[in-house]
Amino acid sequence: MKKKIELLETYLSLYINHHEVLEDMEKDGNKYKVIDVRNAPKKVKKDKIKNSIEIPAKELKEQLDTLSKDYIYVVYDWTGGTILGKVALLELLKNDFEAYELAGALEGWKGMNLPLEEV
């Protein structure tokens, strides 16, 4: 049972909730940088989280040198059930970036009517 609890605690530690990210956005936006890692053309995406940067998961490894380690990165994809966010998070963590996956992904953000912008 202890191993299951430890595994679940580790799993949950990889996520950040919407409210924490939104609070930073409403202040000065200097703590977190949100990355949209969806591998889709703009016409398919249509919108994204306000002020997020777009780096498709398939291109993230090649663009790591454009990211500063002064920020905490929050990655998201379409829904919490897809793996792009997890793949991107793994890449960031393997390269010593502080990073989290957004709990609920874009679907959860939209469901709470939080700030979006067109792509």
Task: Give names to the regions the model predicted.
Residues 57-64:
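Alpha-helical scaffolding within the catalytic cores
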Residues 16, 55-56:
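Short acidic-hydrophobic, aromatic-tinged amphipathic segments that line or gate anion-handling sites
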Residues 111-115:
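Short secondary-structure transition/capping segments
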Residues 34, 52-54, 99-101:
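Conserved beta-strand scaffold positions in the cores of enzyme catalytic domains, especially
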Residues 1-45, 118-119:
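Flexible, polar/low-complexity N-terminal or interdomain linker segments that lie immediately upstream
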